[in-house]
């Protein structure tokens, strides 16, 4: 009986130490502030990248940003591995006429505009957002709510 309690306590300690460390994210995804992020190096147009993100996991879309700290985290993941200067982010007016919104439906609270257009790419070297032709192909970042 004592051994069972010891093993059970050990498993509880391991479980508690893993909670909040990214253990809730799928493998190959990075955790930040209750969300998971993954950089995909393959190049797609905006619509295909958004579709690809939604097919990865339920509640996954092209990345949306709520703060400059979140942008800095994503840049820290994208800049070291990408050779491209731009990545698609989830901001566009594809789904909602002229009103820009994130592909996951959230409203635009934080922005870092360089220009305005249908589909927005983030420049990996200076964190600015650029309007791009939606048919151009770039790597992209998916964001998953956990």
UniProtKB/Swiss-Prot annotation:
GO BP, sorted A to Z: venom-mediated suppression of platelet aggregation
Keyword Signal assigned: yes
Stretch forming the signal peptide: 1-23
A Pfam family the protein falls into: Lectin_C
Keyword entries, A-Z: Disulfide bond, Hemostasis impairing toxin, Platelet aggregation inhibiting toxin, Secreted, Signal, Toxin
PROSITE patterns: C_TYPE_LECTIN_1 (PS00615), C_TYPE_LECTIN_2 (PS50041)
Location (main, coarse): secreted
InterPro entries hit by this protein: C-type_lectin-like (IPR001304), C-type_lectin-like/link_sf (IPR016186), C-type_lectin/snaclec_domain (IPR050111), C-type_lectin_CS (IPR018378), CTDL_fold (IPR016187)
Tissue expression notes: Expressed by the venom gland.
Intrachain S-S bonds: 25-36, 53-142, 119-134
GO cellular component, one term: other organism cell membrane
Cellular localization per UniProt: Secreted
One annotated GO molecular function: toxin activity
Domain C-type lectin: 32-143
Protein role: Snaclec that dose-dependently inhibits platelet aggregation induced by ristocetin or low-dose thrombin, but not by high-dose thrombin. Binds to GPIbalpha (GP1BA). In vivo, also dose-dependently induces thrombocytopenia of mice and platelet counts remains at very low level even after 18 hours intravenous injection.
Note: Negative results: does not induce platelet aggregation in either platelet rich plasma or washed platelets under high-dose conditions. Does not inhibit platelet aggregation induced by high-dose thrombin. Does not react with polyclonal anti-GPVI and anti-GPIIb antibodies.
SUBUNIT field: Heterodimer of subunits alpha and beta; disulfide-linked.
Family: Belongs to the snaclec family.
Name this polypeptide is given: Snaclec jerdonibitin subunit beta
Record organism: Protobothrops jerdonii (Jerdon's pitviper)
């Amino acid at each position: 009986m004592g051994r069972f309690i010891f093993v059970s306590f050990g498993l509880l300690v391991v479980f508690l130490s893993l909670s909040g460390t990214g253990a809730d994210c799928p493998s190959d995804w990075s955790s930040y502030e209750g969300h998971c992020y993954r950089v995909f190096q393959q190049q797609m147009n905006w619509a295909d990248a958004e579709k690809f993100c939604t097919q990865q996991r339920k509640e996954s879309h092209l990345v949306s940003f709520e703060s400059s700290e979140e942008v800095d985290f994503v840049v820290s993941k994208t800049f070291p591995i990408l050779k491209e200067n731009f990545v698609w982010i989830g901001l566009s007016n594809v789904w909602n006429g002229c009103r820009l919104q994130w592909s996951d439906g959230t409203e635009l609270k934080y922005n870092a505009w360089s220009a305005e257009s249908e589909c927005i790419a983030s420049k990996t070297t200076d964190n600015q957002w650029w309007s791009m032709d939606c048919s151009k192909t770039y790597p992209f970042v998916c964001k998953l709510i956990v």
